[in-house]
Amino acid sequence: MTRKNYTSLTEFVLLGLADTLELQIILFLFFLVIYTLTVLGNLGMILLIRIDSQLHTPMYFFLANLSFVDVCNSTTITPKMLADLLSEKKTISFAGCFLQMYFFISLATTECILFGLMAYDRYAAICRPLLYSLIMSRTVYLKMAAGAFAAGLLNFMVNTSHVSSLSFCDSNVIHHFFCDSPPLFKLSCSDTILKESISSILAGVNIVGTLLVILSSYSYVLFSIFSMHSGEGRHRAFSTCASHLTAIILFYATCIYTYLRPSSSYSLNQDKVASVFYTVVIPMLNPLIYSLRSKEVKKALANVISRKRTSSFL
C-alpha cells in the first residue's frame, strides 16, 4: 500500500449524514432553518444585552460571549455541511479540513470555560451577595472572558502541533460531516496512540476541569437556595440558575459521550448523531433556553418591542 503523508494529500472526502438524495434535501432544509435560527437568535441575544442597560451585568456579559461563540462555532461547521448536502463531490481541502477542526476545538474550549465562569458568577451572586460587586467587578469579568478565549487559542496551538503531523494512506474518506479529531485518528495510518492520548487528556482537562467548577459552584448554590426562608426567594434564585443548568446538561452530555469514552467503543454513526447536537442543535437552543427561563431577558425583550411600537406611532 502506498503511503501518503500530510504534505502530499490535497483533500478529504466527507461522507456526511445521508446517502440518498431525498434524505439529503430534507436534511438540507432542516439544518438551513436551524442555522438561520441559530444566527438570528444568538445575534439577537447579543444585541438585546447590548442595548438594555438592565442586562449590563457579568452574567449577561458571559451570555453575550457564549452567543458569539455559538454563532462562530455553528458557522465553522454548518455552511460546509449544507453545501455538501447539495453537492455530489463532498470534498474539503487538507488545509480547510484542519482549519475547520482547529477553529472548532478552540471555540469548544472557550465555550466550556464560559459555562464554568457563568456557574462561578451564579455562586458569587447567590452565596456571596454582599461581596458580589467586588468579586465580579468589571475588571475581573473582562479578564475572565479574555482568559477563556486565550485558553481556546492555546488549545488550538497545542492540537496543531500533534494532529497536523498525522500521516494518511490511500483512503482520504472521512466518515463524518465535518473534520474532527476522532475520525481523523481513525483514518490515519500513523501510530496514533500517543496523539490520541494527548488529545484525550486535553479534552479531559477542559471538560472535566470546567465541569468540576460547575458542580462545586452549584453545590454551594443549591445549598444556599434550600437554606432560604423565603419561598419567593428560593423560586427566583432557582429560576435564575435553571436555564444555565439546562444548557450545561445538553452540552456536556454530548461532549463527554463523544470525547471521553474509550476509543474501543467509538462508533462512527453514533458519534455523528451526538456531534449534530453540540455543533448544530445546541447553539440554536441556547438563546431560546435563556430567553424563556430568564425574567430579565423577557422583560428586556418586552421593553424593546414596546419602544419600537411607540416609535412607529410617532
UniProtKB/Swiss-Prot annotation:
Cysteine disulfide partners in this protein: C97-C189
GO cellular component: membrane; plasma membrane
Keyword tags: Cell membrane, Disulfide bond, G-protein coupled receptor, Glycoprotein, Membrane, Olfaction, Receptor, Sensory transduction, Transducer, Transmembrane, Transmembrane helix
First-listed, main subcellular location of the protein, grouped into a coarse class: membrane
Membrane topology value: Multi-pass membrane protein
Entry keyword annotation includes Lyase: no
SUPFAM superfamilies reported for this sequence: Family A G protein-coupled receptor-like
Extracellular compartment segments: 1-25, 76-99, 161-196, 259-271
GO BP terms in the entry: sensory perception of smell
Subcellular location field: Cell membrane
Free-text function comment from the UniProt entry: Odorant receptor.
Protein known as: Olfactory receptor 5F1
Organism: Homo sapiens (Human)
Protein's gene: OR5F1
